[in-house]
């Protein structure tokens, strides 16, 4: 039991004092203690098990994929999970150097600020398609936030001299401060604006 209490993420960052502020995301963001965020896909076996996967591992998983753009996906981060984890680890060190804060806390704030509350869905009624505003479940909110962060970082870093780690660190800091300069926060606001117009 004493060993579990002393587990530090990447042997550096303590997860015990981090709190999820958004009450809707408390069940969806897992801050389970582990040294290396790698569960070998155990969370994929059951339907809602991904809620138990550490939020850092879920970010690393999202960083392995580049949306639906085939040309940008081919040959890059294709299942190279340790490469993705090392990218996140280096970005965390940059965040700590720039802000002096625990980078996992910065990630949690970034996810909270990038998670949309409303989305739209299509309803076909009498042969006509209507877009209707719907509330988003906590698990999908976290999924969308992580996707917005990963896609925004990859898009910004594509064919740029600056490294992916630096872009990820900058993006997480901006999103944690809830500034619209962060592409994930901008995307969230756009999604909620469209949903508000579809009410």
Curated annotation (Swiss-Prot):
GO cellular component: small ribosomal subunit
Keywords: Ribonucleoprotein, Ribosomal protein, RNA-binding, rRNA-binding
InterPro entries: Ribosomal_uS7 (IPR000235), Ribosomal_uS7_arc (IPR026018), Ribosomal_uS7_dom (IPR023798), Ribosomal_uS7_dom_sf (IPR036823), Ribosomal_uS7_euk/arc (IPR005716)
Signal peptide: none
GO biological process assignments: translation
Top-level taxon of origin: Archaea
One GO molecular-function entry: structural constituent of ribosome
NCBIfam families: PRK04027.1, uS7_euk_arch
Quaternary structure, from the entry: Part of the 30S ribosomal subunit.
Family the UniProt entry places it in: Belongs to the universal ribosomal protein uS7 family.
Function field: One of the primary rRNA binding proteins, it binds directly to 16S rRNA where it nucleates assembly of the head domain of the 30S subunit. Is located at the subunit interface close to the decoding center.
HAMAP family the UniProt entry points to: Ribosomal_uS7_A
Protein name as annotated: Small ribosomal subunit protein uS7
The gene coding this protein: rps7
């Amino acid at each position: 039991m004493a060993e579990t209490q002393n587990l530090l993420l990447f042997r550096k960052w303590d997860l015990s004092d981090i709190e999820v502020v958004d009450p809707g995301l408390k069940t969806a963001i897992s801050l389970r203690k582990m040294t290396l965020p790698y569960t070998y896909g155990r969370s994929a076996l059951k339907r809602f098990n991904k809620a138990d996967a550490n939020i850092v591992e879920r970010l690393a998983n999202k960083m392995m994929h580049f949306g639906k753009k085939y040309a940008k996906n081919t040959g890059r981060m294709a299942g190279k999970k340790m490469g993705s984890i090392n990218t996140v680890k280096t970005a965390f060190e940059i965040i700590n150097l720039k802000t002096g804060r625990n980078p996992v806390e910065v990630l949690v704030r970034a996810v909270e600020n990038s998670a949309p509350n409303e989305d739209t869905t299509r309803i076909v009624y009498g042969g006509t398609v209507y877009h209707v505003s719907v509330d988003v479940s906590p698990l999908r909110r976290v999924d969308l936030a992580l996707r917005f962060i990963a896609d925004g970082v990859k898009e910004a870093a594509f064919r740029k001299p600056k490294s992916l780690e630096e872009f990820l660190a900058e993006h997480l800091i901006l999103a944690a401060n809830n500034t619209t300069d962060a592409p994930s926060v901008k995307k969230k606001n756009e999604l909620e604006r469209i949903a508000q117009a579809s009410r």
